[in-house]
């Protein structure tokens, strides 16, 4: 059986470069977006991204990477609360892939 715990993200071992840390952030945001559409409406995901961008990037003047990080924190919390409350997935029960049968959504604007 594989270890279900998350691996240590870049930046914590002291051996990764900043480029590797940014690549990890990009991969993680894309992966959570792909999973989130199985549990939350696409429109909600895009609204969270757009509001995060407006607040953190436009109003607060933070970097794109920091904005992605704050967005990731919000989406992770939404996924956690969904699972904790035994939320039903858009495609049926927890763990089932379904709901949106099309290709995964494009990343939110600015993540390309």
From Swiss-Prot:
For this entry, the protein name equals Protein Vpx
Spell out the residue ranges making up region: Disordered.
90-112
Q: How does it assemble?
A: Interacts with the P6 region of unprocessed GAG. Interacts with host VPRBP/DCAF1, leading to change substrate specificity of the CUL4A-DDB1 E3 ligase complex. Interacts with host NUP153.
Chain coiled-coil ranges: none
| GO CC terms | host cell nucleus; virion component
Q: Where is this region: Binds to human NUP153?
A: 61-80
Q: Which GO terms describe its biological process?
A: symbiont-mediated suppression of host innate immune response; viral life cycle
Enumerate the subcellular locations listed in this protein's record, separating them with semicolons.
Virion; Host nucleus
Task: Name the domain of life this protein comes from.
Answer: Viruses
| Encoding gene per record | vpx
Task: Sum up the protein's function in the record's words.
Answer: Plays a role in nuclear translocation of the viral pre-integration complex (PIC), thus is required for the virus to infect non-dividing cells. Targets specific host proteins for degradation by the 26S proteasome. Acts by associating with the cellular CUL4A-DDB1 E3 ligase complex through direct interaction with host VPRPB/DCAF-1. This change in the E3 ligase substrate specificity results in the degradation of host SAMHD1. In turn, SAMHD1 depletion allows viral replication in host myeloid cells by preventing SAMHD1-mediated hydrolysis of intracellular dNTPs necessary for reverse transcription.
Q: Which UniProt keywords apply?
A: AIDS, Host nucleus, Host-virus interaction, Inhibition of host innate immune response by virus, Viral immunoevasion, Virion
Q: Where is this motif: Nuclear localization signal?
A: 65-72
Q: InterPro entries annotated for this entry?
A: Lentiviral_Vpx_assoc_factor (IPR053711), RetroV_VpR/X (IPR000012)
Pfam families listed in its UniProt record: VPR
The family classification in the record reads: Belongs to the lentivirus VPX protein family.
Q: Where is the composition biased (Gly residues)?
A: 90-101
Compositional bias (Pro residues): 102-112
């Amino acid at each position: 059986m594989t270890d279900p715990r998350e691996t240590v993200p870049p930046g914590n071992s002291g051996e990764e470069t900043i480029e590797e840390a940014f690549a990890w952030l990009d991969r993680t945001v894309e992966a959570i977006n792909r999973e989130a559409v199985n549990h939350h409406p696409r429109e909600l995901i895009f609204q969270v991204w757009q509001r995060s961008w407006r607040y953190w990037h436009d109003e607060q003047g933070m970097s794109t990477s920091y904005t992605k990080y704050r967005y990731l924190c919000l989406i992770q919390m939404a996924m956690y609360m969904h699972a904790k409350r035994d939320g039903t997935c858009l495609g049926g029960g927890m763990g089932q892939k379904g709901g949106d049968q099309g290709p995964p959504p494009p990343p939110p604007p600015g993540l390309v």
